[in-house]
């Protein structure tokens, strides 16, 4: 099977133009088919703060009110997505920007209230149009996904970018040899977020559960690792969490294993 690299890049990388441009240059030279999923939470939080709109996070996941959703669509599907697309086009990559609503490529349902926790207008992925995605890839396009989906009934939904990357990897594993890479501003998963030297080179699912229970791993890393291990369980060949500047180096970062 052909190789497909799915990269998720965090908002802390793309919010700084120089760092973003360096990352896009490295992404552009990845051989074979590739897909990029981007976040942008830090930019959304900053905009909400400037507009005096309250934001709330629960276990690393954003609570999405109607006001926050409007900002998310503007920031994610608008500014960030198009800056990435034009950056890659300038590097010779035929980038094509998407939300899940475009061509009905990712359909979600609103997350139900569980244990009295209501995440608001957050979407959990139900279906991905794999046939259409394959058509875009085979025509030489590089899909760039913003973390916005829809429910098929006219409602846009905020969907975790880590989850989108993981779900894309899971459904495409039947057609490609999939490599899934999560990029952010650290070397990889850390024992201590404040200590770069506490880098974990290999993380098993058993260790992940233990670290989660002990509070060693938490916050935004939880949905990232949940999605990553789900993808690994579904047959994705390689899952790595690494620093964006190391995307070219396959041996770097935290490698996950079941």
From Swiss-Prot:
Cellular component annotations (GO), alphabetically ordered: cytoplasm
Catalytic activity: N-acetyl-L-glutamate + ATP = N-acetyl-L-glutamyl 5-phosphate + ADP
Keywords of the record: Amino-acid biosynthesis, Arginine biosynthesis, ATP-binding, Cytoplasm, Kinase, Nucleotide-binding, Transferase
Pathway where this protein functions: Amino-acid biosynthesis; L-arginine biosynthesis; N(2)-acetyl-L-ornithine from L-glutamate: step 2/4
An example molecular function term from Gene Ontology annotations: acetylglutamate kinase activity
Enzyme's top EC category: transferase
One Pfam family linked to the record: AA_kinase
GO BP: any one term: arginine biosynthetic process via ornithine
InterPro entries xref list: AceGlu_kinase-like_sf (IPR036393), AcgluKinase_fam (IPR004662), ArgB (IPR037528), Asp/Glu/Uridylate_kinase (IPR001048)
Kinase found in the keyword field: yes
Cellular location(s): Cytoplasm
EC number: 2.7.2.8
The protein's role, per its UniProt record: Catalyzes the ATP-dependent phosphorylation of N-acetyl-L-glutamate.
Family that this chain belongs to: Belongs to the acetylglutamate kinase family. ArgB subfamily.
Protein name as catalogued: Acetylglutamate kinase
Species the sequence originates in: Azobacteroides pseudotrichonymphae genomovar. CFP2
Name of the coding gene: argB
């Amino acid at each position: 099977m052909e190789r497909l690299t799915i990269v998720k890049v965090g908002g802390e990388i793309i919010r700084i133009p120089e760092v973003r441009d360096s990352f896009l240059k490295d992404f552009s030279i990845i051989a074979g088919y590739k897909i990029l999923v981007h976040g942008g939470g830090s930019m959304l939080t900053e905009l909400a703060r400037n507009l005096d709109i309250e934001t709330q996070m629960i276990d690393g996941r954003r609570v999405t009110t109607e006001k926050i959703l409007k900002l998310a669509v503007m920031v994610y599907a608008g500014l960030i997505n198009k800056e990435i697309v034009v950056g890659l086009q300038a590097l010779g990559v035929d980038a094509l920007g998407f939300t899940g609503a475009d061509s009905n490529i990712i359909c979600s349902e609103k997350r139900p209230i569980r244990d009295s926790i209501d995440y608001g207008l957050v979407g959990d992925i139900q279906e991905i149009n794999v046939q259409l995605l394959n058509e875009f890839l085979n025509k030489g396009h590089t899909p760039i996904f913003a973390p916005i989906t829809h429910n098929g009934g006219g409602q846009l939904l905020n969907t975790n970018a880590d989850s989108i990357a993981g779900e894309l990897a899971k459904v495409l594993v039947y057609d490609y040899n999939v490599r899934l890479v999560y990029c952010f501003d650290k070397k990889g998963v850390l024992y201590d977020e404040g200590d770069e030297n506490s880098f974990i080179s290999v993380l098993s699912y058993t260790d992940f559960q233990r670290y989660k229970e002990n509070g060693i791993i938490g916050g935004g890393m939880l949905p990232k690792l949940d999605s990553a291990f789900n993808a690994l369980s579904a047959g994705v060949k390689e899952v790595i969490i690494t620093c964006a500047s190391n995307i070219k180096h396959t041996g770097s970062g935290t490698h996950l294993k079941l």
